[in-house]
Amino acid sequence: MSRRPARCLRALLLAAALASGLTAAQAALPAGALVYGPPVAPPPAERWASDPGDGVYYQVFVRSFQDTDGDGIGDLRGLTARLPYLAGLGITGLWLTPIHPSPSYHGYDVTDYRAIHPELGTMADFLAFLDAAHGHGLRVVLDLVVNHSSDRHPWFVAARAGDPRFRDWYRFASDPEPLIGTLGGSAWHDAGDGTRYLGLFVAEMPDLDHRNPEVVQAMLDVAAFWLDLGVDGFRIDAIQHVVEGEDGAIANAPANLAWVAEFGARLRERHPGAFLVGETWTSTPTIAAYHRDAGLDMSFDYPLWRVLTSAVQARSAIDLRAQLELNEDAYPEGARRGTFVGNHDQPRAATAVSLLRVDPTRVVLLGRLLLALPGTPFVYYGDELAMPNGPGDDDRQKRTPMRWTATEGGGFSAGQPWFPPSTTDPAISVEAQAGDPASVLEAYRSAIALRAAYPALARGNAVVVRDLPASVLAVWRTLAGEAPVLVLANLSNRDLEVAPAQLAAPGVDPGGLVPLDGAPLAGDGSGAWSLPANTLRLLGPAR
């Protein structure tokens, strides 16, 4: 398929963007709002030749990031205006949750895969954002919802009405075998004509039938459309559910892995540089199979998320050590894993590791673990400020407006925000934390910079030191041709002492280590180091 029509469309839309002055998007921020982050030089040419799995990504729920038109809903112009902040933080890639038209605020039930939700902006806004992001050296990954559409999508409307072409794009049955969906109820829903249709999540999200080659081709065309416009890749939503098994399995069936392999291979025939990361919400051996058997570029490491969070909660490194060793054994060489400590579906990191009120010290510890251990970190917007969940179990409480300023509204919008902020604490804001070396934000900025400075942190293997107290984590990050880095953390709430001799591991020498991250390590006079409570340090050979 020729890319020329898409390129022509892109040129026309970009011209419209420039004519409307979108490159001056910062001027559209609410009065008094500040743009944080130092001036950013153009990215080096080698940035784009590097592995897209390198660097640090940032997940943006666009609706909650920055509003520029006063309607209380974050938009693409707002995201464009905040790119200097993200680049100044050291971020190298962005994952945007769905930005397509949808009847739902979250966007995971799409009605038009080739358009921008009008509440978030226009296609011209998106292209202006995309060019600006690339100008700051940021890759852009979009959410691609392939498993299901909205029940209001024209495809499903036609299918439900009996259109013979689209009827086979979904799964209808007169008397289907019982099947339990992902949320516990029946996966079959009344179509209103004596039949039922499959929707593994909810009735408003009917499953597309990817056993039909026309459906696969339609989604390949959607992906190619966005890649032609300049998008760098996709996060495949619900990747483990796309094709059900013949035995009724709704997740990780052999046919599903075959679909992942085929979809990736066919997409790269048209776009060799396309980058795919999967929402692999499953066990480590099963995730490894998506790499080994299906060639997935990157998975999300849900098992590591669980043990990272629980390690800080329980002040114990035992399960985290075991998971790191399991990962070293389970994944094939070169498998990229997206790591995270929060996202739009999980409790925010600050809420997960705090008790009655946000505990910045433990939030920093969790963030530094994320940024020092193997994988490609994905930072959920606001986690770098210790933004907590709002009250209650509503998923919207994990997706509240970003706090830019120390004001009650946080500088998100000049109007009434679409959802209340999770906190009005002035200390939890970019304005309050930027430049404060004791803040969570500056701890994240420093940890991201250290990761970029030491290749072993970004791409190295993990060699776990075993014979240590339960609350001490010691992991050597090693990479051929590069100096090793020791990640040393005290997860407990009291100071501990560790002797260098305790940190020996196969292939690495604990002698002659110096701190790589600032202040010297205090000792007790006998050669042991004192590790303060809730602290992570990075050490390496003296250069």
Task: Kindly label every feature range from the protein language model.
Residues 11-23:
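Bacterial N-terminal signal peptides
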Residues 141-142, 235, 277, 340-341, ...:
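Generic enzyme active-site microenvironment
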Residues 36, 48, 52-53, 264-270, ...:
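Loop/helix patches that line or flank the sugar-binding groove of alpha-linked glycan CAZymes
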